[in-house]
From Swiss-Prot:
Pathway(s) where this gene product acts: Nitrogen metabolism; urea degradation; CO(2) and NH(3) from urea (urease route): step 1/1
Localization per record: Cytoplasm
Protein name: Urease subunit beta
Family designation: Belongs to the urease beta subunit family.
Organism: Opitutus terrae (strain DSM 11246 / JCM 15787 / PB90-1)
Source lineage: Bacteria, Pseudomonadati, Verrucomicrobiota, Opitutia, Opitutales
């Protein structure tokens, strides 16, 4: 099995993140080292060397398959799609910018 892999029943469509708000933004790595962000990491709390509209990302994560990540090489700029966090919408730990309800 591949991390994040989903094996749906034969003939049934796979539907992920349906109905959740998404947004696309441009992210630049202003640092001198690569930064990798995992699929379920609260994007608002990513490394400070990543430059983007941080306030717009509160309550969002990368819209990529579970168990995968996006790597931002030093000096790179790329566009990413984010999806709203679901469930209880509570975030704890990470960089301690929320530590509670969104």
């Amino acid at each position: 099995m591949i991390p994040g892999e989903i094996i749906p029943a034969a003939g049934l469509p796979l539907d992920a993140n349906t109905g959740l708000e998404t947004k696309v933004l441009t992210v630049a790595n202003t640092g001198d080292r690569p930064i990798q962000v995992g699929s379920h990491y609260h994007f608002f709390e990513t490394n400070e060397a990543l430059e983007f509209d941080r306030d717009a990302t509160r309550g969002f994560r990368l819209n990529i398959p579970a168990g995968t990540a996006v790597r931002f090489e030093a000096g790179d700029t790329k566009r990413v799609e984010l999806v709203a966090l679901a469930g209880a919408r509570e975030v704890y730990g990470l960089n301690a910018r929320v530590n509670g309800k969104l």
